[in-house]
Amino acid sequence: MILVTGGCGFIGSHITDALIEKKYKVLVMDNLSSGSMENLNSKAQFVKGDITNTEDIEAVFKKYPIDAVCHHAAQISVAVSMENPVFDINTNIIGIINLLQACEKYKVKRFVFASSAAIYGNPVYLPIDENHPKNPLSFYGLSKLASEQCIRIFAQDTDMTYAILRYANVYGPRQRAEGEGGVVAVFMNRMVANKECYIHGDGKQTRDFIYVKDIAAANVKALECHVSFTANVSTNVYTDIVTLFNVMKKETGYEKQAVYTQPRKGDIKDSYLKNTGIHELLSWYPEYDLSKGLKETAEYFLHA
C-alpha cells in the first residue's frame, strides 16, 4: 500500500489518480487545511490526519501495511513562509521528521518527496542542474532544502530508499492560486471571471512550467524505482509571462489586454531546470507541451 500525504491537494490528488490507474492500493492522509474531498479519487482510502501530529501518524502506520510513502503534505506558499516562518518550518520540517520516524519504525521501503526549485534561489547559471548552488531566498525554500537532508540522514541507517523530486513551476486542474506555479491559476481564475490580469514588470521574466500529469507520472516511476536519487522534474524549457498570458488568452477566449504593474520585489528574473538526470534514470520525459497542458487546464477552470 502506498501512503500519499496531501492526497486531497492539487499535486497529491493527481498522483493518487495515476497510482490507482496502475492498480496500486492507495491510502490518502490529509488534514484538509487546503486540500478538498472533491479532489479525492473514490477508489482511494482516506484518513483525516495531520503530519505535525505524531498520534495521527502512528495511528495510520499501525493500522495500514504501508510499503511506500509519497509525501506531498506541505505548507506551499512562499508568502506565508515569510509571514509565519515558524508555521512553515513546523509543517514542512517537523512534519517530515515525524513521518520519517514512523517510516523507520514500520520499515517502509520507499520514500518519495516533493521538493522544489525554490531551494536553488537566484540562478548562477541556466539551465539549473542538480549540482547548482543552493541558496533559498524564502523560508519555504529553506524548509524544502532541510527536508531533503532529513531524508538522507534517515536513509543512512535504514533499508529505506528515497527519491527527492525538485519541481519546476507546476500547473494544471485543481490548482489553487497560492502555490509556486500559482500564476497560471491566478490568470485562469481572473480570465474565467472576465477580470483584469496583472503582469508584474515587463513580463519578460521566464519560468519552467510543467503540467501536473507529467509530475504525477514522474512520481509513479520514482515509486517503482529502488535506487536513491535526487532529480529535477521540469520541461527544460523557459516561457516568459507575456507568452504564457497570450497562450492562456487563446485557450480561454479571454479578450482583455494585460495590465502591467510594478515589478515585484525579490522576484527571480529567469529560471528553468535541466531534466536530463531523471530522463536518464527513469526514462521519464514530459508529454505535455505548454499549449496542450494549458488547453486541459482551461477546460477544467471553464467548467469548474
Give short role names for the model-derived ranges.
Residues 192-304:
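C-terminal substrate-binding subdomain of Rossmann-fold SDR/epimerase-dehydratase oxidoreductases
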Residues 146, 150, 154, 187, ...:
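Hydrophobic alpha-helix immediately C-terminal to the catalytic Tyr-X-X-X-Lys motif of short-chain
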